[in-house]
Swiss-Prot record:
Cofactor(s) named in the record: Mg(2+)
Gene name of the record: vgb
Residue spans crossing the bilayer: none
Function: Inactivates the type B streptogramin antibiotics by linearizing the lactone ring at the ester linkage, generating a free phenylglycine carboxylate and converting the threonyl moiety into 2-amino-butenoic acid.
InterPro entries per record: Streptogrm_lyase, Vgb, WD40/YVTN_repeat-like_dom_sf
Name of the featured protein: Virginiamycin B lyase
Length: 299
């Protein structure tokens, strides 16, 4: 492990208040309109931050909007964890939602698949679903317990974290699933993203580690200096590294593809960073205490 702690100066990190502390900014994604879209998990809303003037527009949706991702149809798609539905909103604010086949399934992760559809996890039902752009839903058994985040892999499959199965899952578009157990007990993986090296990278919220898995199933784990950091979401950054949020320590981390880790503090240790995404050449993360943080990526 090679971890360096650094402090951002005021030009490197800025925080923007976008809601009251009770609304809960949770996940975020850049939309096809160039704006930053984010979920307000406790308010039942999806919001848009204008890229020019920073104005925030809030759109009411179903209960518990959680993860959000752009779709191939020019809309934003998101999971409604407490409403047990999949939501869709256009850049103009037109909203629709679709019911999975399994009731009370607790949809959480969502991503655009390699087949032109959106894929999502049903964490409470141990299933993975697929919804087409016109709302047709199909489902497959997940290859393990409590599927959480998921992403499209470079091999044409969907990869997901199996939070309570302590494994990483792979699912082909036709529903064939494989689970790869993690070597660390109680790792409880959550976030996952495709890396620039052709592997999948994921967070181990229960073990304070960042993991890497190749498309053939070879696993590597990188421990953080603080085992209680609770790494949550992860994304590929614009500089060839992976960036992740440390929910338990109020920090943002960066890991290179050869395993070098750097950790940066945000304004407060209790700011609760969750989702992280690339937008306007920088990293943005959602702070559940009511703000979005913009982190300028070092050269």
């Amino acid at each position: 492990m090679n971890e360096i702690n650094e402090s951002y100066d005021t030009d490197s990190v800025r925080e923007f208040t976008v809601s009251d502390a009770d609304a809960g900014p949770y996940a975020l994604a850049e939309g096809p309109d160039g704006a930053l879209w984010f979920t307000l998990v406790h308010r039942g809303a999806v919001a848009r931050r204008d890229p020019d003037d920073g104005r925030v527009t809030v759109h009411p949706v179903g209960d518990g909007p959680t993860v959000i991702a752009p779709g191939p149809d020019g809309a934003l798609w998101f999971t409604e964890y407490r409403a047990h539905r999949i939501g869709r909103i256009t850049p103009e604010g037109h909203y629709a939602s679709f019911a999975p086949l399994t009731p009370e399934g607790g949809p959480f992760g969502i991503t655009a698949g390699p087949d032109g559809a959106m894929w999502f996890t049903l964490s409470s039902a141990d299933r993975v679903g697929r919804v087409t752009m016109d709302g047709e839903v199909t489902e497959h058994p997940a290859p393990g317990a409590f599927p959480s985040a998921l992403t499209a892999g470079p091999d044409g499959a969907l990869w997901c974290t199996l939070n309570q199965g302590n494994a990483i899952g792979r699912l082909t578009p036709d529903g064939h699933g494989t689970a790869y157990p993690l070597p660390t007990p109680g790792a409880a993986p959550v976030g996952i993203a495709a890396g620039p090296d052709g592997a999948l990278w994921f967070t181990e919220i229960g073990a304070g580690r960042i993991g890497r898995i190749t498309v053939t199933g070879d696993l590597t784990e990188y421990p953080l200096s603080d085992p209680a950091a609770r790494p949550h979401a992860v994304t590929a950054g614009p500089n060839g590294a992976l960036w992740f949020t440390e929910w338990g320590s109020g920090r943002v981390g960066r890991i290179t593809v050869d395993g070098r880790v750097t950790s940066y503090p945000l304004s407060r240790t209790d700011c609760e960073p969750h989702g992280i995404a690339v937008h306007d050449g920088a990293l943005w993360c959602a702070l559940e205490t009511g703000s979005l943080a913009r982190i300028q990526v070092p050269a």
